[in-house]
Regions:
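Interdomain motor-coupling "hinge/lid" segment immediately C-terminal to the ATP-binding subdomain
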Residues: 128-247
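Accessory nucleic acid-recognition modules appended to NTPase machines
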Residues: 200-365, 369-370
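N-terminal pre-Walker A segment at the start of P-loop NTPase domains
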Residues: 1-14
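Conserved catalytic cores of phosphodiester-cleaving nucleases, focusing on short active-site segments
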Residues: 346, 366-385
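Conserved lysine of the Walker
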Residues: 31
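Hydrophobic positions on the alpha1 helix immediately C-terminal to the Walker A/P-loop
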Residues: 34, 38
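Short glycine-rich substrate-engagement loop in P-loop NTPases that contacts/grips substrate
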Residues: 53-85
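Hydrophobic anchor at the beta1->P-loop junction of P-loop NTPases
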Residues: 23
Length: 435
């Protein structure tokens, strides 16, 4: 299975300013596989340590963090001397041993020649809870579920993925039905590696759904196992409310949908926990369009999306036939899935900050507004071929962005102020807007 993140890891290896690396991401997005695959491709040997199951290595880090002593212990574990240039050290589930995380500071300061990559299913929570590790002494990489482009490659449509990267929209339009059919499959399957691998091998949607159910069950088990006891019920309520939150026309998160009488102060910690472990994307509102967008962020108003579009469909009990064949009643939630999909793809674009816009009266809403670092780009999402963009036009007249994006099932089309970018090509947003 091809992951674009491999290319980032190869660049990391060659960087003269390389620091030891922490990979963040939700459970089961493929962090362990990625690290091991990187080791196979780029190193003579890989030394893999899982701190959740290897008590001996946990004990190694329990006393002092002298790096010479630690390297000796790692060499004894490996059974030979470690070659810094040709060996990859993998610390998996590193949040289970906070001192192993803290040791990265000393490895960086005293033995930077070694190549160390770390990951953990709940590492985001450990980092935000104050586990000691040196900010500025490590590099970070965020891993998400497979993007739509990676899904195309995994399902033997690599040439179609290459065509997207070339932005040959004339050729893309000729084969748009292939893209649309694959996009519908992606809405159901999503990008969780196990689900994609299963579909690529067996083409069995029922098997995919069972895998998704198991992943969701594992997430719920994490709530009980790792979250503070007092917030576990609130975690479940927030998590289970997301499909109904997104099914609304106005997808702003409403606490009253979680529980009658619910207030922000009762659920803020639960939402932060879900966000820290990578299970949700919290997209905040902005009410202006200045650079940087973060300066206009309204922290009290936000949308919550889950980590994966396939998991959202599973949570909502969406049937394969409804999604792939269509249904007259399948209208509102199609919009939810489409917006979830777009959010998920935008999150995979490097150096892109994602928000949404409403004016203070609430009479104008733009589904997403992104900060590319160079410009602010409004993005209107349409589930089908609907080309009406009233709110986008209002935003354009008020803020005059260089370009506005409407993404839909319609073909690519560039107008004076507006670009219609097909949903299956939304990952090309930065390239298209910079052109």
């Amino acid at each position: 299975m091809y992951r674009i993140a491999i290319e980032k890891l190869l660049k990391w290896k060659q960087s003269k300013r390389r620091k030891h690396l922490i990979i963040e991401g939700a459970r089961q997005v493929g962090k362990t596989w990625l690290m091991k695959e990187f080791g196979k491709q780029a190193y003579t040997e890989t030394i893999y340590i899982n701190f959740d199951s290897n008590s001996r290595m946990a004990e190694l880090f329990a006393s002092d963090l002298d790096t010479d002593r630690l390297i000796m212990g790692l060499e004894l574990y490996a059974g030979h001397k470690i070659d810094p240039d040709n060996s990859l050290l993998i610390f998996d589930e590193v949040q289970e041993v906070p001192r192993a995380l803290a040791s990265l500071k000393y490895f960086y300061e005293n033995t930077p020649q070694y190549h160390i990559v770390c990951a953990g299913s709940l590492l985001g929570i450990a980092l935000h809870q104050g586990t000691s590790f040196p900010v500025g002494k490590v590099d970070f990489l965020k891993l998400y579920p497979l993007s739509f482009k990676e899904f195309l490659i995994a399902t033997d449509k690599e040439r179609f993925a290459e065509l997207l990267d070339k932005q040959d929209f004339g050729m893309i339009t000729c084969f748009k039905q292939t893209y649309i059919d694959s996009l519908k499959q992606y809405y159901f399957i999503g990008g969780m590696p196990e689900a994609v691998q299963s579909f690529a091998e067996n083409k069995d949607f029922n098997e995919v759904r069972e895998i998704q159910k198991h992943i969701l069950a594992a997430y719920e088990q994490d709530f009980s196992k790792h979250a503070p006891n007092e917030i576990v019920p609130r975690l479940r309520r927030v998590w289970n409310s997301i499909p109904s939150q997104l099914a609304k026309e106005n997808k702003k998160f409403i606490y009253g949908l979680v529980r009658d009488g619910a207030r922000a102060k009762d659920y803020e910690t639960a939402i932060m926990w879900l966000s820290d472990c990578g299970l949700v994307h919290k997209i905040s509102r902005v009410n202006a369009a200045g650079i940087p967008l973060r300066a206009n962020e309204d922290l009290k108003a936000f949308k919550l999306f889950v980590v994966d579009v396939g998991l959202l469909g599973c949570m909502a009990g969406l049937r394969q036939r409804t999604l792939l064949d269509g249904n007259a009643l399948f209208v509102e939630f199609k919009g939810a899935l489409t917006e979830q999909y777009v959010c998920q793809q935008l999150k995979t674009i490097e150096d892109l900050e994602v928000y949404y816009y409403t004016n203070d009266r609430g009479s104008c809403e733009v589904d997403f507004v992104v900060d590319t670092g160079e410009q602010i780009v409004p993005v209107e999402v349409k589930a089908e071929v609907n080309l009406r963009a009233k709110s986008l036009k209002t935003y354009q007249e008020k803020f005059s962005p260089e370009v506005s994006i409407r993404t839909s099932m319609s073909d690519y089309k560039k107008e004076e102020w507006l670009v219609n970018l097909p949903l299956y090509a939304i990952d090309q947003l930065k390239v298209v807007t910079d052109a």
